[in-house]
Amino acid sequence: MQNPSAENSQPPLTEEQVIENLRQTEDFSDQYYAAWWLGRMRSRHPESLPLLLAALAPLHDNPIHDERRAVALNAIRALGILQARSAEEDLRSLLKNNDYSVREESARSLGMIQAKAAVQDLCELLSGAPDELEQAQSGSAKLKEPYESVLEALGSIGVASSSVITIIKPFTKHSRPLIRASALRALLLLTGEQAWAPPLIELLQHDDPLIRRGALLDLGATGWMPALPAIKAATVENSLKLVALRGLAEKSDDTTVLDAMDALL
């Protein structure tokens, strides 16, 4: 399928046209784009949520149609962006889906919705013996569960119970740096304890630029103001620094963040 963000020579679609494209079931490319568009444009059309929820139904088919699966994944993402509380029950059920990507996107969207009822479901995905948490799936680099998105979701939801903190802590020692970063981000958000920040800042010095980028965005998401100098000095693209700084600005009235953003423009 064509990338939804790809430019083309066609005139822009209206919201009504997009709704009709998602409603019809013959052209999967139109459905795929429509599901993406409704999230991207923060649609408040009364039919947006019902149609996006209906697009999830094929995920329960066995076998699942590949193109319907792609539409459903875009619908999951859109429901998160739209913070659709009416989708919580459906998204929670999808955390038990056999498809890794479905679980990953559902966890991420539940975090965006801040679905407190999903905390126990998310914690169950983090359970397991230490060796299980490190073990990759057969023939794949993927681990047993999408730990990054689950950890980030728990941080975003904000339930700082002792049981949640306890289940997150082991992931700060995980062998994969981005999983460590997600755990540190979650703990910094949930506890406000500065002890979780230095290991996250250290990842800004990692040799792998992907890890530096991930750590930068995680720091920004925490809103932890003392991270400002490290974010400014990070060897990362200015466009990503702006995203991280915006995260700080959204949680602070300190004008030095805005000054740092202006300096990058």
From Swiss-Prot:
Pfam families per record: HEAT_2, HEAT_PBS
InterPro entries, alphabetized: ARM-like (IPR011989), ARM-type_fold (IPR016024), PBS_lyase_HEAT (IPR004155)
GO cellular component: phycobilisome
Keyword Ligase: no
Cysteine pairings via disulfide bonds: none
Assigned keywords, A-Z: Antenna complex, Lyase, Phycobilisome
Keyword Disulfide bond part of the UniProt annotation: no
GO molecular function per UniProt: lyase activity; oxidoreductase activity
Annotated family: Belongs to the CpcE/RpcE/PecE family.
UniProt-recorded name of the protein: Bilin biosynthesis protein RpcE
Organism of provenance: Synechococcus sp. (strain WH8020)
